[in-house]
A protein has these predicted regions:
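Arg/Lys-rich, positively charged N-terminal/basic patches that mediate binding to nucleic acids
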Residues: 1-35
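Alpha-helical transmembrane segments and membrane-interface helix-loop junctions
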Residues: 3-5, 17, 37-39, 43-49, ...
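Generic beta-structure capping elements
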Residues: 6-8, 46, 85-90
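Residue-level recognition of specific faces of alpha-helices
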Residues: 12, 35, 39-42, 65, ...
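A short linear boundary/processing microfeature
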Residues: 19-22, 49, 90
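Short, hydrophobic secondary-structure boundary micro-motifs
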Residues: 29, 51-55, 96
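A short, surface-exposed loop/turn module that caps and links secondary-structure elements
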Residues: 41-67
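Enriched for short, Lys/Arg-rich terminal
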Residues: 61, 68-99
Length: 99
């Protein structure tokens, strides 16, 4: 298995890092992003660990989400590739979730 990060997921990580750099500290921002990436790596051992995402079911890809603090790591599995589609802040409206 391998991980693949979609462009929207990579953009979201940059947004998260930028926000926390300004509103917390650069060190906290890096620690948060590193933690999210580390949690995503755990999917390589247990790709079905996350819960199904009903909001994205209409896409037919079997999206799942894994909780990481106040964030959800949104992904789907396609063969041997785990596609990370979003790092979603749960304080946002669910319709902003990227799949």
């Amino acid at each position: 298995m391998k991980l693949s990060y979609t462009l929207p997921a990579r953009q979201r990580l940059v947004e998260i890092e930028d926000y926390f750099t300004v509103h917390a500290s650069p060190k906290a921002a890096v620690r948060l992003v590193d933690g999210l990436l580390s949690k995503a790596l755990g999917l390589l051992k247990h790709p079905k660990k996350g819960k199904p995402v009903k909001l994205l079911a209409h896409r037919g890809l079997g999206h799942r989400s894994l909780s990481a603090g106040r964030f959800l790591i949104v992904y789907y599995v396609d063969g041997e590739i785990i596609h990370i589609t979003d790092f979603f802040d749960t304080r946002q409206h669910p319709t902003r979730m990227r799949g």
